[in-house]
């Protein structure tokens, strides 16, 4: 089976639609990338996992649409201030584009999301009951703060941190994540509260170290970005409970990120 690829622009998103060479009214999938600015192939260090998956699916009779993230590669828009809700809107536009194509079976359109893309898939499928299926690859099923706490623990222990040391650190990390759950405060107010929490145990000498303070400020700025705040507060499990379509969730046993 061959395949036919075509470039298109959906609102401000640039992407590629691959179609099987023979037949019509194909089932189709929209592929959604993970966190960070990703191109349509989700390219990293020379690897193009979305290209590989799209190629395999198309050769097996499934049409695939994948796009560069907003503000990335050939897509327009701003990535830095976008949240997963914004990316869900982009994904909805991709689904609607597929429905407009005569080659696609509009009743058999699903979403494949990788990492944070799995979260986005759940958001879209909850809003749109006609989504045929969802595949979550290394996605999340719990609220962001719980996920991040477990992730930090697994990564720290994989690097040799004794459990006793981790148990000593855990309350401080959990408290900082709890600060981010305060939806009645502005990002600037959260930054001040986080800064006070992080620096309360630092010595006067450490507080005078410009490099240390700059690193802390950069980390706090990242933690209070629109995307991170939405991620930490959102519980995909609540949306997952409401889905009526089939869901396939795949997670690697050794994947600790």
Predicted segments — roles?
Residues 1-5, 10:
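Single conserved hydrophobic/aromatic residue that forms the stacking wall/gate
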Residues 25-35:
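Short beta-strand element of the alpha/beta-hydrolase
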Residues 52-74:
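Conserved alpha/beta-hydrolase
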Residues 81-102:
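Alpha/beta-hydrolase active-site loop
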Residues 137-241:
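Accessory cap/linker subdomain of secreted extracellular hydrolases
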